[in-house]
A protein has these predicted regions:
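Membrane-proximal intracellular helices of multi-pass ion channels
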Residues: 1-340
Length: 340
């Protein structure tokens, strides 16, 4: 029950039942809205086949919100079809926010609370998420606008669509894989960082989570400005949260480093490609540049294990650190060391 409470973002065991009800209801509502929004576009794509359209609408709606990242026929996002792609993008984006954020937004909307009264977790998650999405969108347009492998003879619309997909999907959703091997090495590295960060805490996304990344940045800002407290939105972040963020980030960074080097040794691939596939596996991004294949089963097993650790690792580390500990019987004197 304590692990469930931690995963759902509540601190009271008595709230688990109520929060679970809201979580299930929210999932059904978002998936239902996505189903309705997808039907017209898929109906046109399937040339009026109602039965197949109903099946695909249901499948895409459930899969998008849960960030599963695969399709029944390998068709991806029906590339350049905005009527199908936008609902999937929106649903996948909601799935990466996390249950505490969705719950806080729903309660704030019901009680008509202004944004300034949102919880600190909601503010950090939304702010960091939107910054990452905008940065990814801008990066892709600037770096890949003249990429002839991707946009040979295409106009502005395909470029904008691919930029939107690159801004939302790599963090945990996957889907259309066909264009990824054609991007530049700089974009691969950038997307590797995005996939390593992942989505919101207690969400369907992977990675170290955006709040962890935000706390690390806030800690750096406090260190550079000589402040003892780590503050955000006129609130002080607890020291335990900072320790958890540092521990999760360090452990996951070590994992990505070791796995990337192992892939380089096994498959003789470049550092860029090894890093990309490793971060994609760890962050549950669903993308690949073809580092592992049937000819190298060891690499496939390593990536599969990385996916498993990426799904459970950050949560396990956070829970192990945040659980109550007995006070130490002895507290040693402080002594300065040289760092940096």
């Amino acid at each position: 029950r304590m692990l469930t409470a931690n995963e759902l973002g509540t601190t009271k065991l008595g709230e688990i039942k109520g929060v679970l009800t809201v979580v299930i209801t929210t999932a059904f509502v978002i998936e239902g809205i996505t189903f309705v929004a997808l039907f017209p576009g898929l109906y046109k794509v399937n040339h009026g086949n109602v039965r197949h359209t109903l099946w695909e609408s249901l499948f895409f709606a459930v899969m998008a919100y849960n960030n599963a990242g695969f399709t029944p026929d390998g068709a991806g996002l029906h590339v350049n079809n905005w009527a199908v792609g936008l609902p999937i993008l929106a649903s996948a984006f909601c799935g990466t926010l996390g249950f505490p954020v969705l719950l806080n937004l729903m309660r704030s909307w019901r009680m008509r609370r202004p944004p300034k009264r949102w919880s600190l977790h909601t503010k950090l998650t939304l702010t960091t998420t939107f910054c990452i999405v905008i940065a990814s969108f801008t990066w892709f347009l600037l770096m890949e606008w003249n990429n002839k492998l991707l946009f040979a003879g295409d106009g502005i619309e395909p470029r904008l669509w691919h930029a939107m997909v690159a801004a939302v999907m790599p963090r945990s959703s996957g889907f259309d894989l066909s264009w990824m091997p054609g991007v530049s090495d700089a974009t691969k590295v950038f997307l590797s960082i995005v996939m390593f960060i992942g989505g919101g805490s207690t969400s369907t996304a992977g990675g170290i989570r955006v709040t962890t990344f935000a706390v690390i940045l806030l800690t750096c800002r406090a260190a550079f400005t000589g402040r003892h407290d780590i503050n955000a939105f006129h609130r002080r972040i607890h020291t335990q949260a900072v320790m958890t963020a540092v521990a999760v980030s360090t452990a996951c960074l070590m994992l990505v480093t070791v796995v990337s080097m192992a892939l380089m040794i096994i498959t003789d691939c470049s550092l860029c490609d090894a890093l990309f596939d490793t971060c994609s596996a760890f962050g549950l991004g669903g993308y690949s540049v073809g580092v592992a294949s049937e000819s190298s089963p060891t690499a496939l097993y390593i990536l599969a294990a990385t996916m498993f650790i990426g799904r459970l690792g950050p949560l396990t580390i956070a829970y192990a650190i945040s659980r109550p500990h007995n006070l130490e019987a002895v507290r040693y004197p402080t002594e300065q060391i040289v760092v940096g």
